[in-house]
Regions:
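Oxyanion-binding/catalytic loops of NTP- or PPi-dependent enzymes
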Residues: 1-95, 101-105, 109-114, 121-606
Length: 606
């Protein structure tokens, strides 16, 4: 069976994972980096993704897209309050957000597809095989529009999305908690842009989401903004410069704040260095962990309120929680771990990398789907998809065909008509898009109080047991009466548009890969040229003249190749330059060590 990978398509970073020897593993790039920044930029030589794109945040913020996950399955009206936070240009066409890069507009699924293509290519390069199938994770609160947009992104990227699973479920799978017979799990997910808390109930191998809560505008970015405000104020007071008038320098301030926050998870203090605009020198200061925590405490405490609300919604107390799992880079902060442990009364699981845990869990789910997990007995699968009728006579699937059973799915919905007094639930079985082409299983009607459209909160649960018996429950969260519905996205990419994008992705696959390899080779060559040229300038006197001349020749040859269109030639010239400069680099390292140890005793360094 073809390999299935697990993908964490994140707001800030994305990862791809696979199973090896029964254990989930993250796919690294050739430099050993596991995370791909969820950033797409328009450079002079075309669109770039990941680490190289992130570098454009400071140089060209208006042509660099980040946090696109916030816009998946949404229209402009849904994100009005967020528009001021993003330097790039957003428009709307046919109810779909469009992001302008250069002369073209892209939908959020198209941007996300570029990130997925990067992950797909990374996996193919590392594993040495074609990757066409994936499990992708989404936040538990993602509605059907957002889930469908994620599937669309996968299709555009040339991936068959076999399963969309909730991030908290993936985190629990990564820790192997599904091997327990039962239990209640709190998944505390403090990421870059959002905070989510999910309460899961595990019974007989089934994960059920009891409650979710959170804040879509609370994350590590808020901690970064606190540091930015601090640095901007100090720069203004000390140097008389208002960095807010310099967008590129504001990005530099933000990145330095982010780096400092990360360093202080492991260190007690760190040095801040920020280059000032208009060549007015640099701003430096020391920042301690205590200072960061005094700034961050108000933000971190805001995560505890959703936790308490989720516990209340689930009808639980903190002592009822059996396991606590941490997800997201912000949970590395010691203060976060202390407050979470204090709230739930038990130390959280944190031995797995919190940035990687969701992707690892996605790989576990992928392994289950591929039949690779031998210690789990899969009794049966659903032969046909199960879903409900939505607006326009469309079937919306909650439990997909070939889902292992027992299984459950839960979603939150609302109404579309003011004063609506009832909701008709039409349960369907089949694989076709339209209701008329599928098999009708049952109908029921639920009364709801007459409220403005969009106000009712209707929770729908599909539960199919090991005998294949389906139970559908819907609950009006205001009245506690039962109610059920799932909605086909009122906006999103049309089937024709998705198909066209898929066709184009295959039609131009070879051309796209070739162009990408050329861009990557040029970027790597530019970096190697700069570092080698600098090394030669600083330490050329430490090697023989003939050796220095050979390095200069290799530099010239690579510079010429870089301007060409043959990425293989660029890679070859890079290898030649690396070989020519190998001794120089070794001499530089040796010289640096000698100078570092000069005047010290053996006891000082032993």
């Amino acid at each position: 069976m073809a390999r299935i990978v697990g993908i964490d398509l994140g707001t800030t970073n994305s990862l791809v994972a696979y199973m090896k020897d029964g254990q989930p593993r993250i796919v690294p790039d050739r430099n050993g980096r596991t995370m791909v920044p969820s950033v797409v930029a328009l450079a002079d030589n075309g669109l770039i993704v990941g680490n190289s794109a992130k570098e454009h945040l400071t140089r060209n913020p208006e042509r660099t897209v980040y946090s696109v996950k916030r816009f998946m399955g949404k229209g402009l009206a849904d994100v009005q309050n967020e528009l001021t936070h993003f330097p790039y240009h957003l428009t709307e066409t046919g109810g779909v957000i469009r992001i302008r890069l250069g002369q073209k507009n892209y939908s959020p699924p198209q941007i996300s597809a570029m990130i997925l293509k990067e992950l797909k290519l990374r996996a193919e390069t590392y594993l040495g095989e074609s990757i066409t199938k994936a499990v992708i994770t989404v936040p538990a609160y993602f509605n059907d529009s957002q889930r469908q947009a994620t599937k669309d992104a996968g299709l555009i990227a040339g991936l068959e999305v076999l399963r969309i699973i909730n991030e908290p479920t993936a985190a629990a799978l990564a820790y192997g908690l599904q091997k327990n017979t039962q239990g209640t799990i709190a998944v505390y997910d403090f990421g870059g842009g959002t905070f989510d808390i999910s309460i899961l109930k595990l019974k007989d191998g089934i994960f059920e989401v009891l409650a979710t809560n959170g804040d879509t505008h609370l994350g590590g970015d808020d901690l970064d903004r606190l540091l930015v405000d601090l640095f901007v104020a100090e720069i203004r007071d000390r140097h008389g410069i208002d960095n807010r008038h310099y967008p590129d320098h504001m990005q530099a301030v933000r990145l330095e704040g982010e780096r400092a926050k990360i360093r202080l998870s492991d260190e007690l203090k760190t040095e801040i260095t920020i280059e000032l605009p208009e060549d007015k020198g640099r701003f430096t200061r020391e920042l301690t962990r205590d200072q960061l925590e005094s700034l961050a405490i108000s933000v971190i405490e805001r995560t505890l309120t959703p936790c308490r609300m989720a516990l209340k919604d689930a009808g639980l107390n903190p002592k009822d929680i059996d396991e606590v799992v941490l997800v997201g880079g912000s949970t590395r902060m010691p203060l976060v771990r202390q407050l979470v442990e204090a709230l739930f009364g038990k130390p959280p699981h944190c031995h797995l990398n919190p940035d990687e845990v969701v992707a690892l869990g996605a790989a576990v789910q992928a392994d289950i789907l591929s039949g690779g997990t031998t210690d789990m007995l899969l009794l049966d699968v659903t032969p046909l998809s199960l879903g409900i009728e939505t607006m326009g006579g469309v079937m919306s699937s909650l439990i997909r065909r070939n889902t292992t059973i027992p299984a459950s799915a839960k979603e939150m919905f609302t109404t579309y008509v003011d004063g609506q007094t009832g909701v008709d639930i039409h349960i369907l079985q089949g694989e076709r898009e339209l209701v008329k082409d599928n098999r009708s299983l049952a109908r029921f009607r639920l009364k709801v109080p007459p409220l403005p459209a969009g106000v009712p909160r209707i929770e729908v649960t599909f539960l199919i047991d090991a005998n294949g018996i389906l139970n559908v429950t819907a609950t009006d969260m205001r009245t506690s009466q039962s109610q059920s519905i799932e909605v086909k996205p009122s906006y999103g990419l049309s089937d024709m548009e998705v198909e066209k994008m898929i066709e184009d992705s295959f039609k131009f696959a070879a051309e796209d890969i070739g162009a990408r390899k050329l861009i990557e080779a040029r970027l790597d060559a530019e970096s190697l040229l700069k570092t080698t040229d600098k090394s030669l300038a600083e330490a050329g006197h430490l090697v023989a003249r003939e050796e220095a001349d050979a390095i200069r020749i290799a530099l010239s040859q690579l510079s010429t190749a870089k301007d060409g269109t043959d990425f293989s030639a660029i890679r070859a010239r890079m290898a030649e330059l690396e070989q020519a400069a190998k001794h120089l680099n070794a001499v530089m390292l040796d010289d640096s060590l000698k100078r570092g140890l000069q005047g010290k005793k053996v006891s000082d360094v032993s």
